[in-house]
Amino acid sequence: MEPRFYKIPVCVGDVSLRVAKGHFATRNSHTNYFVDVTNQQSCIREAEAAAQQLAQRNLSQHMMVDTILCMDGTRVIGTCLAQKMTQGGFRSINAGREIYVLRENVGSNGQLIFRDNARFMLEGKNILLLLASVTTGSTVRRGIQCVQYYQGKVAGIAAIYS
């Protein structure tokens, strides 16, 4: 039987989450709800709306960011977020700066790895971890360990849903 989805509006704007009730198992947990963030991850209009909400929630005003590390398939949202955070008209300490958008690469052992040509985007940089959702924190922990391994500094953690 296919789960029945409900739309739940989130805060302000056009962003809504599709939620299904039931029993769902992930690698790290069991949950009673499945939150589908596919539209926010792949539709530019919804990605821009999600990025706008994230940027307005104090990410832009108080957090210096050099690199956005996009995890869980959030690269489209990360690109939109970098654009919002660097806009001159938006109240942001990142206005006019360059922000790199980097997606995760998972090695055969499950660790996050980056090629030599991408390391400069992490080493000594202020990094924002961007995730689709946070339930147990294990993905966040992997992201933090990766940033520390590449000698970056975790500036913050943002999720579409937590």
What are these model-derived regions, one by one?
Residues 23-25, 33-38, 50, 71, ...:
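Long, contiguous hydrophobic alpha-helical segments, chiefly transmembrane helices and signal peptides
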Residues 3-8, 98-101, 126, 130-132:
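N-terminal start-of-chain detector that recognizes signal peptides
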Residues 6, 28, 33, 100, ...:
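Sequence-level detector for tyrosine residue identity
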Residues 28, 66, 124-126:
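Nucleotide donor/acceptor-binding cores
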Residues 1-64:
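Active-site-facing substrate-recognition patch
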Residues 92, 105-162:
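PRPP/pyrophosphate-binding module of the type I phosphoribosyltransferase fold
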Residues 40-119:
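Conserved PRPP/pyrophosphate-binding segment of the phosphoribosyltransferase/PRPP-pathway fold
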